[in-house]
């Protein structure tokens, strides 16, 4: 199986040129993305320091990691917590194994958007200065009061913050019954799985882990990597169990993991969560990227239960039938056929994976055919489809970083800090690596983890926030204006959940119909700007915007002006019977 992929990588190298990539272990394409001359399509700089995103991330040891707990890093969220129309930034933080003075404990950070390219840290004022082994974050208005609430996952008890609407948050975890079982939670997503108008909550769980009994580097086979003692896991450690909470509508949730048959899928190390209606039946499904084990694709049975169909659907393994070490995931219609596809990042000595949706309930691994099989050196985490040049074709951003600091000392063919990768969608089902010309925000090496994207300044140019291990976050700002048009859609549910999470949006512009969904969560344990962004290319108008709401209502909105964020309220459009379920 490995050799099949190795030969495929070598074939691509030869097709590109004799010097395009240099084979290494397992067909490793060892050339860095920063080594080829290219025309600038996008140019990203890291503007975090100037913008005020200065708080360091703290996550375990710096030079060595004794336990797997110290390696996973944290997610980030882009959301408008104060409803001023400008997205703000929330960065989850971790801690260390050693003792630390109480007043110096690292905390999560909330940054308020000042509308001028800068942010102000309002963490203390907002009541979000929580400490612990933070992991992921997802956003959703669970009580439909018009203000976005925050759910933060931890190694330990998770936390639900209710947005009070006055710039502050209240920890309502115990009241809401969503703390979990004290396990190691990772990715999460608010999702109205039963379409009752109230957001439910799905939480992925990684490893059943206890520092007191965990093996140490070199203790067993799973504690070695390429002959070097490293932290142990996840293989050899007990797996966690994913959780589902049903929103009762009174400020509380009910644990329905067993009732919904979520726990019938076992033996997986769950990492990131992405929701999508992959079979277009109007009911949200759930994809979980899993470390060192097959991915999970929970199909919504429309009766309050789910069935894992990843294997039969072709989304559990790569095309060689090999389970991969999945980290992050993103959803998008990369080839413009109206179906939602899945992209997943993986561990080093492997490629990322692109699953093309065939429209019949199955997927094909088209990684190599799409030109995405170039790199096996990097260890991928956060990833997102985003249209960097607004040409109407979603591009791909990948964040990388190794888990073993030892790679720098032992010269194992990888670096602990790795560059990001930016692929430009060519509009013909393939991608081109444009990292070399995409600016220092892409080519500078960091040990990245979480990634969220959004239109931070409402100008149609998508920015990205990246959490970095034991360093401040990065704020990747695109300096180029493409000249293409765009539109952003903010959904406001009335019968459906207020955020419109789960709504499928179709935009008709010229000869193209663009498709995406409103979703919470995704990437690596992160949450993106939920205003859905569409690049329109040279089209100077949109014919219509169609929204299929979770309630089942499908309606069209006409005469929406382009080059701006437009709000669409459920029930205010023209009813359309072409997509109701």
How should each PLM-predicted stretch be described?
Residues 9-20:
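Bacterial N-terminal signal peptides
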Residues 86-93, 145, 149-154, 201-205, ...:
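Hydrophobic beta-strand segments that make up the repeating blades of beta-propeller
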Residues 73-83, 112, 133-147, 162, ...:
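Beta-propeller blade termini
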Residues 26, 30, 36, 43, ...:
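Gly/Ser/Thr/Pro-enriched helix-cap/hinge segments flanking short amphipathic alpha-helices
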Residues 92-106, 205-237, 399-416:
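Short, conserved, GDST-rich strand-edge loop motifs in beta-rich repeat architectures
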Residues 44-46, 118-128, 168-178, 251-263, ...:
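Blade-edge beta-strand/turn elements of extracellular beta-propeller
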Residues 108-113, 241-248, 299, 355-356, ...:
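Beta-propeller blade signature
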Residues 53-75, 126-138, 177-189, 238, ...:
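Repeat-based blade/solenoid architectures
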């Amino acid at each position: 199986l490995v050799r099949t992929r190795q030969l495929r990588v070598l074939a691509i190298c030869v097709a590109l040129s004799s010097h395009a990539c240099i084979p290494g272990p397992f067909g490793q394409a060892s050339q860095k993305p920063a080594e080829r001359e290219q025309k600038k399509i996008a140019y990203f700089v890291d503007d975090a320091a100037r913008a005020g995103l200065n708080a360091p991330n703290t996550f375990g040891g710096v030079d060595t990691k004794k336990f797997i707990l110290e390696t996973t890093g944290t997610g980030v969220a882009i959301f408008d917590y104060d409803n001023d129309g400008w997205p703000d930034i929330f960065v989850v933080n971790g801690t260390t194994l050693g003792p630390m003075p109480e007043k110096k404990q690292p905390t999560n950070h909330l940054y308020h958007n000042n509308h001028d390219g800068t942010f102000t840290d309002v963490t203390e004022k907002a009541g979000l200065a929580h400490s612990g082994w933070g992991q992921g974050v997802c956003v959703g208005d669970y009580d439909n009061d018009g203000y976005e609430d925050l759910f933060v996952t931890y190694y330990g008890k998770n936390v639900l913050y209710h947005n009070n609407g006055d710039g502050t948050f209240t920890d309502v975890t115990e009241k809401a019954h969503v703390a979990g079982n004290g396990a190691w939670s990772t990715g999460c997503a608010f999702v109205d799985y039963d379409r009752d108008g109230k957001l439910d909550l799905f939480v992925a769980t990684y490893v059943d882990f206890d520092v007191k009994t965990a093996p140490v580097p070199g203790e067993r086979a799973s504690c070695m990597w390429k002959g070097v003692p490293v932290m142990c896991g996840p293989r050899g450690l007990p797996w966690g169990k994913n959780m589902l909470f049903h929103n009762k509508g009174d400020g509380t949730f009910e644990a329905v993991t067993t009732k919904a048959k979520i726990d019938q899928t076992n033996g997986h190390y769950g990492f990131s969560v992405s929701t999508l209606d992959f079979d277009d039946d109007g009911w949200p499904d759930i994809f979980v990227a899993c470390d060192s084990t097959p991915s999970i694709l929970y199909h919504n049975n429309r009766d309050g239960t789910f069935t894992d169909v990843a294997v039969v659907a072709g989304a559990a393994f790569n095309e060689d039938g090999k389970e991969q070490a999945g980290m992050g995931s993103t959803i998008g219609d990369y080839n413009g056929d109206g179906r939602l596809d899945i992209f997943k990042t993986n561990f080093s000595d492997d490629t990322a994976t692109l699953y093309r949706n065939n429209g019949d309930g199955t997927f094909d691994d088209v990684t190599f055919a799409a030109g995405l099989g170039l790199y096996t050196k990097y260890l991928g985490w956060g990833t997102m489809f985003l249209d960097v040049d607004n040409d109407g074709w979603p591009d791909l951003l990948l964040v990388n970083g190794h888990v073993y600091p030892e790679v720098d000392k032992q010269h194992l063919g990888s670096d602990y800090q790795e560059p990001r990768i930016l692929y430009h969608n060519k509009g013909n089902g393939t991608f081109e690596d444009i990292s070399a010309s995409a600016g220092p925000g892409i080519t500078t090496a960091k040990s990245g983890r979480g990634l969220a994207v959004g239109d931070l300044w409402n100008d149609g140019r998508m920015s990205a926030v990246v959490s970095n291990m034991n360093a401040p976050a990065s704020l990747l700002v695109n300096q180029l204006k493409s000249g293409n048009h765009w539109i952003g859609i903010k959904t406001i549910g009335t019968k459906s959940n207020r955020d419109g999470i789960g709504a499928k949006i179709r935009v008709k512009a010229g000869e193209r119909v663009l498709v995406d969904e409103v979703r919470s969560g995704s990437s690596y344990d992160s949450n993106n700007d939920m205003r859905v962004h569409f690049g329109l290319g040279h089209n100077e108008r949109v014919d219509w915007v169609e929204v299929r709401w979770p309630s089942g209502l499908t309606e069209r909105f006409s005469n929406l002006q382009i080059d701006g964020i437009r709000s669409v309220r459920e029930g205010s459009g023209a009813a359309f019977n072409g997509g109701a379920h």
